[in-house]
Swiss-Prot record:
Principal cellular location given in the protein's record: other
Entry protein name: Long polar fimbria protein A
Gene Ontology terms: biological process: cell adhesion involved in single-species biofilm formation
Pfam families: Fimbrial
Family: Belongs to the fimbrial protein family.
Coiled coil stretches, renumbered: none
Signal sequence segment: 1-24
Gene that this polypeptide is encoded by: lpfA
Highest rank taxon of the organism: Bacteria
Record organism: Salmonella typhimurium (strain LT2 / SGSC1412 / ATCC 700720)
Subcellular compartments: Fimbrium
InterPro entries linked to this entry: Adhesion_dom_fimbrial, Adhesion_dom_fimbrial_sf, Adhesion_dom_sf, Bact_Fimbrial_Adh_Pro
Gene Ontology CC, one term: pilus
Length: 178
């Protein structure tokens, strides 16, 4: 009888361990973050255009021999969707952020440790015209449905001497309609 009792206790102990393991394997938690915005505008910005990263890549220092020298351009776009052009037919886009200290029409690269100096970032519209930081705008005629706004960006030398380092920056874009 004692042997049978030990066998039952062992079986119940094993079952408790297996049950706990199974329960632990099934438990878990997490967080779901919802973001969005309700707007009163002729178009909405496509979700894939709201937060973008434009990779300017590694650029050799020796291409910057004088103020105004540029790296190769990297394209990016802002997609507008569900455009209703019954009351507004044009969109103005401006870019806002920290302007370069030597050329305020350009975006300043971040000044953290290890940052490059002597360069800013230029943003150009589809006609290759510089959209001046904080003061400029590009205007595009809207199409019903979807309108894609095409831009390019590149590094621009703001000093005769450019130092190596990170060339990161961030800007906001703002839309206004007419």
């Amino acid at each position: 009888m004692e042997f049978l009792m030990k066998k039952v206790v062992f079986a119940l102990s094993a079952l408790a361990v297996v049950s706990t393991s199974a329960f632990a394997a099934e438990s878990g938690d997490g967080t779901i973050k919802f973001t969005g915005e309700i707007v009163d505008a002729p178009c909405v910005v496509s979700t894939d255009s709201q937060n973008q990263e434009v990779v300017l890549g590694q650029v050799k220092k020796n291409i910057f021999k004088a103020i105004g020298d540029k790296s190769s351009s990297k394209p990016f776009q802002i997609k507008l969707e569900d455009c209703d052009i019954t009351s507004n037919t044009k969109v103005n886009v401006s870019f806002n952020g920290v302007g370069d200290t030597d050329d305020a029409t350009l975006v300043s690269v971040n000044t953290e440790a290890g940052a490059a100096t002597g360069v800013g970032i230029g943003i150009y519209d589809n006609a290759n015209k510089l959209v001046e930081m904080n003061t400029g705008k590009s205007t595009t005629t809207l199409a019903a449905g979807q309108t894609v706004l095409y831009y390019t960006a590149n590094y621009v030398a703001t000093k005769d001497t450019v130092t190596t380092g990170y060339g990161n920056a961030e800007v906001d874009f703002n839309l206004s309609y007419e």
